[in-house]
Amino acid sequence: MHFSRRHLTLITQLIIVGITSSCSLNNVKQDNSLKNFFDDNKVDGCFAMFDNVRAEFTIYNIQRDTARFLPASTFKIMNSLIAMQTGRVVDDSTVIKWDGITRKNANWNQDLTVGQAFKFSSVPHFQEIARRIGRDTMQMWLDSVKYGNMKIGTHIDSFWLDNSLKISPDEQLGLMKKLYFDQLPFQKRVMQVVRNMMIQEDNANYRLSYKTGWGFNEQGHSIGWMVGWIEESRHPYFFVLNIETPDTDADIVSIRKNILTGILTQMGFFKGKM
């Protein structure tokens, strides 16, 4: 088993801060049985989970887990945190006006609150939020959080989509853990609002929270993301799913959800017994 010391940020972080005395690379399990979920959907990819109670990692495709990709709309998490922290928006109820340009996604063609824009993953509304934040402020917070390669590039309103900014699945996993436990350099109120915006399913057995992302790399391949956590019995399990395909007709929205649901089901989730 080979691990890149430079990139295994969450694993290294946990060892350094000593979440448990038993936390070590021995707590990392490579689960190649998860390959079937990617093969069945004809995509490449990786999956990683951190069980916070046991301080254990489960990872499929460790090489990809430590490689960096454009964050696409998963960056809406950071964009929201920075905007609320700096007062560019007050909270998830702040209304962002529609720019009047009609787009294919009908949900985007209207005024939206920050919460609605997050739910609909509206690119133009969050581009406006990024412009309000501005380059210098945005860069300061990327540096403070050490978000991926921390590069904004030429355009303040598209750097998370044009492959200027890149982040690894492992780094995304670390970000999710820090967000959940109020360990990011933002006000607790701000982090709570963003956590609430991420809730997708909430019932007696589990609560599933995540943000999706979909963009294109330099080769024109689709890159899909799902980053977040699932809670059962008040215990969080952090996860990151990353997929890639050169097939321009691939239904990334369905594929990433099918893979995540399949993996979590195989692991025993959704029954409230974890």
Please provide the spans of the model-predicted regions.
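C-terminal motif of bacterial Sec signal peptides marking the signal peptidase cleavage site
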Residues: 21-22
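Mid-domain, small-residue-enriched loop/turn segments at the edges of structured enzyme/sensor domains
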Residues: 106, 113, 126-177, 181
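Short, well-structured active-site flanking segments
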Residues: 85-100, 186-191
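Active-site SXXK
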Residues: 68-92, 117, 239
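Short, conserved catalytic-motif segment at the N-terminal edge
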Residues: 52-66
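Structured C-terminal helix/loop/strand segments within mature extracytoplasmic catalytic/sensor domains
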Residues: 25-37, 41, 68, 132-134, ...
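Short N-terminal helix-loop-first-beta-strand/juxtamembrane motif that initiates sensory/input modules
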Residues: 40-51
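Bacterial N-terminal signal peptides that target proteins for export
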Residues: 1-12
